Every structure is written in C-alpha cells, then in structure tokens.
C-alpha cells in the first residue's frame, strides 16, 4: 500500500508542477482597463475607465461590461438586461441611466460590476469593482428649480427634489434652509419634508441671503446622505402695512416741508430783488405806429397821417366860446383889474 500511495503523491505533484509551468492562455494577453470608477450623482449611474492602448494594432479595442446582484449570476449589460448597450463598445464610458433618469439599477440593490477589454479573439482579464448601493453611495446635489417669493417680513421658498424617489416609504428627502440677513449671522431652519418652505418673522424691507440643502434618508439601513448646498441668492423682504403707512407719512411731511422751504426762498428772493425783477418783466416803451411811419418817411405830413388813422370816436372836442368886448369896455375892465 505504501508504494502505491507514494506513486500517487508523485503523480499529483507532477500534475501541479506541469500546470504551474504551463504558459498562460494566449487569448487573455490583452491589458486590462485601468482605473475604473462608478459615478453616482443624484439619479446618474455611470461607469468609466481609462482606454487600453496598443502600439502594434490598428484595430480598435472594444469593451464589455457585466453586472450581478447579490447571489446572482453575471449578466451582460445590454438592451435586454439593463436598457443600454455596454457590449462591444469603443467608448470608455457606460451610462446606465442614459435612456432616462428612472432607468439603471434599482437604487436599493447591491450591484457589482466587472469590465474587460477585447480585440478580436483576444481579451483581457476581468476587472471587478467593489459592490455599491445607490442610496448608500450616492452624491446628493442641491435642490433644483428654486423660486423665492418675498412677502411682508417673510420669504416663501419653492423647489424640486434633486431626483425622484419611486418608493418614498423606503427613502425620502428632508430639507434645510441656511439664511442670514446680509452682513449678519447665519441661521439654519429645518428639517422639512415639504418642497415649500416659509421663512417668517423676518425684518421688513431688509435683504436676506439663503441656501437650500437636501438630505437623503434611507430607512432600510438608517443611512443619511447629506447633499450639497445650493448657490447663494439674496432677496429683499416687503414692508408690512404699518411700515408702508410710516413711509407714506414721512414722504408727505418731507414733500410739504420741501415745498414750504422753496416757497419761503422764492418769497425772500422776490422781496430782495424786486427792482431787478420789475425791470426784467417791465414792457419796454414803444413808439406809436404813425410816428414810426413818419420817422421812416419824413415827407409824409404827420398831422394828415394822424387825422387819417384816427377814428371818429377819437375826434372829441370841448365846446369853446369866444367873447369879444368893445375896445372901450376892454380898457375899463383892464383899469378895474
């Protein structure tokens, strides 16, 4: 029994040695793609890698992507399985959500991807990436379509979520608002489940700046993914009724005071410079038309011109009585005087 056992051991060692010394499969001598990475931003699911460069081949290298779920077999990433074609492609990117944001892998599934390069009958070794779950590993962006409506001492904020969640019982968004009076201290209000938030008790007619932030909560694994802040935007609150009334009163009083000052200044100037003002507004004397014509044409008799132009209404005379005395009576009267 011992010689038989010894020969069996020697035979097994020979087989292992032959297998170890055998050259690798020539069909798998293609370099593998380098630095593959999966991008999970909002609803996006994109796999990218660096291209395989070959100096001795003019044919393009193509790539094949496969995926698997927990305890499942490997599937080829094609139209039938995932909705996009990532088989025999020359691109160095596979966008699983290219068809629509709702496409791609289920966000709560455990997904593993692998990738290899191919050139004719040659292919590289598979490059397997670590598994991921979208809700666990996603980068959440800021809320979108932010609209702010100023109110009386308030700001009403409306927006949409970073991406749609099919089943809100397993995962949902809550929101926070970071706001501050311009030049003041920042405050945070939240969390809110609603996509409409009202900031109340703000000072009227003041400028406030704000940023909105989303946070993803996955109930199944009790995971929180804090999102990015939105861009800073500033708005001025409206004045309330009492403030508007005060402004109207102040404007009215200011206008009346200004008009009073202007009226007083004008009256003072009129008194001080009345002679000059009278001189400015006095109508200069004019020569009668008949005399002006006579000066232009001295040969024209002035009296005839006046008689010609005068109207009958202007020919008015007083009655004149001529009393004559005899020469003797006239001397007596003179002596009496």
UniProtKB/Swiss-Prot annotation:
Residues 31-129, 142-240 form the Fibronectin type-III domain. Residues 269-337 are cytoplasmic. The keyword Chaperone does not apply. The chain crosses the membrane at residues 248-268. It comes from the Eukaryota. SUPFAM superfamilies: Fibronectin type III. It is found in: Cell membrane; Cytoplasmic vesicle membrane; Golgi apparatus membrane; Endoplasmic reticulum membrane. Residues 28-247 are extracellular. GO terms for cellular component: cytoplasmic vesicle membrane; endoplasmic reticulum; endoplasmic reticulum membrane; Golgi membrane; plasma membrane. GO terms for molecular function: cytokine receptor activity; type II interferon receptor activity. It holds the Pfam family Tissue_fac. One of its GO terms (biological process) is defense response to virus. A motif (Dileucine internalization motif) lies at residues 276-277. Changing residue 137 to Q: Complete inhibition of transport to the cell membrane. Residues 1-21 form the signal peptide. CDD domains: FN3. Changing residue 277 to A: Does not affect accumulation on the cell membrane. Disulfide bonds join 86-94, 209-234. It is a single-pass type I membrane protein. Keywords: Cell membrane, Cytoplasm, Cytoplasmic vesicle, Disease variant, Disulfide bond, Endoplasmic reticulum, Glycoprotein, Golgi apparatus, Membrane, Receptor, Repeat, Signal, Transmembrane, Transmembrane helix. Glycans are attached at residues 56, 85, 110, 137, 219, 231. Heterodimer with IFNGR1, to form the IFNG receptor complex. Interacts (via intracellular domain) with JAK2. Belongs to the type II cytokine receptor family. It is linked to Immunodeficiency 28: A form of Mendelian susceptibility to mycobacterial disease, a rare condition caused by impairment of interferon-gamma mediated immunity. It is characterized by predisposition to illness caused by moderately virulent mycobacterial species, such as Bacillus Calmette-Guerin (BCG) vaccine, environmental non-tuberculous mycobacteria, and by the more virulent Mycobacterium tuberculosis. This is Interferon gamma receptor 2. It comes from Homo sapiens (Human). The lineage of its organism: Eukaryota, Metazoa, Chordata, Craniata, Vertebrata.
């Amino acid at each position: 029994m011992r010689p038989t056992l010894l020969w069996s051991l020697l035979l097994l060692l020979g087989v292992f040695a032959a297998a170890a010394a055998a050259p690798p499969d020539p069909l798998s001598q293609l370099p593998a793609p380098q630095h593959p990475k999966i991008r999970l931003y909002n609803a996006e699911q994109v796999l990218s890698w660096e291209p395989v460069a070959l100096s001795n081949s003019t044919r393009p290298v193509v790539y094949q992507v496969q995926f698997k779920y927990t305890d499942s077999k490997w599937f080829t990433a094609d139209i039938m399985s995932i909705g996009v074609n990532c088989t025999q492609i020359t691109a160095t990117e596979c966008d699983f959500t290219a068809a629509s944001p709702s496409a791609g892998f289920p966000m709560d599934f455990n997904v593993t991807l692998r990738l290899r390069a191919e050139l004719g009958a040659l292919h590289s070794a598979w490059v397997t990436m670590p598994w991921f779950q979208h809700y666990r590993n996603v980068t959440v962006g800021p809320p979108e379509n932010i609209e702010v409506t100023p109110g009386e001492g308030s700001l009403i904020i409306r927006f949409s979520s970073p991406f749609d969640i099919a089943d809100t019982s397993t995962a949902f968004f809550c929101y926070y608002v970071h706001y501050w009076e311009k030049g003041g201290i920042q405050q945070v209000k939240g969390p809110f489940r609603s996509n409409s938030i009202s900031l109340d008790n703000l000072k009227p007619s003041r400028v406030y700046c704000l940023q909105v932030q989303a946070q993803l909560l996955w109930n199944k694994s009790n995971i929180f993914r804090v999102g990015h802040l939105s861009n800073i935007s500033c708005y001025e609150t409206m004045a309330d009724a009492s403030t508007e009334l005060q402004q109207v009163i102040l404007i009215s009083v200011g206008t009346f005071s200004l008009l009073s000052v202007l009226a007083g200044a004008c009256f003072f100037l009129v008194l001080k410079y009345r002679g000059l003002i009278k001189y400015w507004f006095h109508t200069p004397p004019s020569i009668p038309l008949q005399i002006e014509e006579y000066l232009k044409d001295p040969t024209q008799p002035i009296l005839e011109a006046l008689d010609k132009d005068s109207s009958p209404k202007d020919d008015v005379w007083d009655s004149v009585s001529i009393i004559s005395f005899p020469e003797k009576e006239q001397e007596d009267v003179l002596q009496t005087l």
